[in-house]
């Protein structure tokens, strides 16, 4: 088997979004699984629309998710001399030609064709032009598309694709200012980089016959193509920012783990048996682009959150502390190692994202300044006050390093007072955490420690 070489080639006209990252992941997995090469190419020939910030953000996103590319990043804007060389080669071999048609002439032609209910297209009027070029017109360069031939290729996702060249006009490969066009530079670079397999979105499917025309004209080897359907939202519509089509780095800010995001995106359009959770090693072992689905996949926040929660639960305390650094939350320095472990172990089970985990840390470590109203209103204050006073005294004599001792202290109150557990636990929870839900009470007492627990009960009794 020959060396597999893939690439990801974004345009830096905007930030890397979720669909682009999925394409990059598919290319990365296929190359790495076969001990091949994976390249990153920045398609920045459209100088008027390029953004340095967007290009840097793409590189930053790659670093975050751990997609390591081979070699240097290739920037197309630095390769104009190479493109000019190949444009001249096509001109010299009479496989391309200068077209002097003005914009006004082209617009007029299109209007005439529309009036005749024909598909607007260039009419090849300069294809075999031998006369004197009109003055004042900077020509474009067009490729001579072979006439009445069938271009066919076996797409790894879509199957057999056939297009008659009569449906393709002599398209422009160099603009009037000399800059090369998208289809031309993509073909040149894929060939010169030795790309064997092109995995990309199916919005590029219509470009492929044009690129094959160029491969053949330049006697380049044609790569294998895999055109992946787009990602839709859960209503079956194109992704919007609200539904997930946002900058990849926003997911880091929202508290998603890179392992969860890679796992989630790899499963959008690809599957292996009925597995949902994949380590990177498993993805490398089982991914094959031939298994990509031919129908669109749906972006599900529920599935992403479920996966993220799974990966969050499997992080150690030390790993969580590193991951939490970008987020703001209460100071942890007063907690001893056992309290810190208990806090994060308890909260990671109840959190779906790092951002949510940071908020829950605040909910535990920040003393309540108000209490959940609907829970507070249900309390029998005549019963609650003496119970908490008694428990406060019991806590003063309890070993806070022993969670079972804390649990026994709570049960002792319930047994001695002959009351239902909820009649005591609910007001205690409200006193400690300010609300009716949250982590277990023995965990809360252990994490807060003796002084803070008693202080919170006293504050509650004042209210």
Swiss-Prot record:
Residue ranges of the motif 'KMSKS' region: 238-242
Residues annotated for ATP binding in this entry: 241
The keyword Transmembrane helix appears for this protein: no
Localization annotation: Cytoplasm
EC number(s) stated in the UniProt entry for this protein: 6.1.1.17
Record's signal peptide: none
Gene Ontology CC entries for this record: cytosol
Keywords carried by this UniProt record: Aminoacyl-tRNA synthetase, ATP-binding, Cytoplasm, Ligase, Nucleotide-binding, Protein biosynthesis
One GO-annotated biological process of the protein: glutamyl-tRNA aminoacylation
Protein family: Belongs to the class-I aminoacyl-tRNA synthetase family. Glutamate--tRNA ligase type 1 subfamily.
Protein name: Glutamate--tRNA ligase 1
